[in-house]
C-alpha cells in the first residue's frame, strides 16, 4: 500500500503498519477474531493501541489465540498465572475480563447464532464508511458506538467503553 493511502498514525511503527495494511477497515465475521478485538480493545483502555499491538502475540499465546470456549474455562488460578507470567499488561481486572467476555460471548452465540451476527446486527450487516478528512474530525464516540457499548454491558461484557 502506498504511503499516501495510509493513515498518519500507522507509518511510524511496524506493528501499526502491519495492522493498518492487513486489518484496519477490513470487515470480519469471524467470531474468534471479533472476540480477540473485543478483548484487545478492553486491554487498551487507558493505554495506547501501539502498546497492545506490541503485546498482541503474548495475548494470543496466553489466551489460546482467543478460542472463546477455552477462554470461558479459564480458572482463577490460570488467570492469576497469566497476570504473573505472560508478557501482557499486568491488570487483573482486564485479564479476568477475558473469561467474563468469553462466557458472555457464548451466551450471545446461542441467542444470535454467532458473535458476528450479534455485532453486525447493529448495522444491518452493512459497513459504515466514514469520510473523515483528518484525525481531528474523528469523534471519541458516536451514537452507534454508545448503543453497542450499552448493549454489550447488558450482556455482561466487562471493561468495555466506546
Task: Place the predicted regions along the sequence by residue.
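HhH-family (HhH-GPD) DNA N-glycosylase catalytic core used in base-excision repair
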Residues: 1-162
